[in-house]
């Protein structure tokens, strides 16, 4: 048993990050206000991994906790990038380790300087062997193995890769620019 004093930060905001394994959808990542009032306040948004920076920001934006990250009653804005990074790391864990059944990080105390996980718990579950890669997930991670470069005329190279979520605006503009024929 390890007992330490509670981490206290003057302008710290208490948040929570979690993940659970749904039998149909696989891992689901949650984010919201944390601390001792987590069950009372019930501020939580959920997303399916894999997360990228855009999806992590969107997950944060969909909660009331996002307002607590802004400058508040004399406290400077909290380091949202630190929370985004924690969400991305949790996403990597549940994507790459199919035997992780649950993750509970509560509270995460975030300040202008960064974020600290004060209490964390990871639950494991048996996984039948052998298991196909990412079979435990509804959405598979971006297939980097399909990226490649090819030589073209003039000594240049052409980069070819699968579409990414951040390509959406450019794809819309491309489609809008096509002729009716």
Task: Locate the predicted segments by residue.
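ATP-dependent carboxylate/acyl-activation modules
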Residues: 1-181
């Amino acid at each position: 048993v390890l007992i330490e004093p509670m981490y206290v930060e003057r302008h710290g905001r208490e948040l929570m990050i979690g993940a659970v394994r749904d039998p149909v959808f696989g891992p689901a990542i949650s984010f919201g206000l944390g601390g001792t009032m987590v069950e009372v306040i019930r501020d939580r948004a959920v997303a399916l991994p894999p997360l990228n920076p855009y999806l992590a920001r969107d997950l944060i934006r969909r909660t009331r906790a996002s307002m607590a990250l802004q400058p508040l009653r004399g406290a400077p804005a909290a380091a949202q990038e630190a929370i985004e990074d924690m969400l991305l790391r949790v996403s990597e864990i549940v994507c790459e380790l199919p035997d992780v059944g649950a993750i509970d990080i509560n509270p995460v105390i975030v300040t202008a300087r960064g974020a600290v996980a004060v209490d964390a718990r990871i639950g494991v579950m048996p996984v039948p062997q052998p298991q196909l890669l990412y079979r435990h997930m509804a959405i598979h991670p971006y297939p980097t193995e399909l990226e490649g470069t090819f030589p073209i005329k003039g000594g240049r190279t052409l980069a070819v890769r699968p579409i990414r979520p951040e390509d959406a605006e450019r794809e819309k503009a491309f489609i809008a620019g096509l002729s009716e024929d």
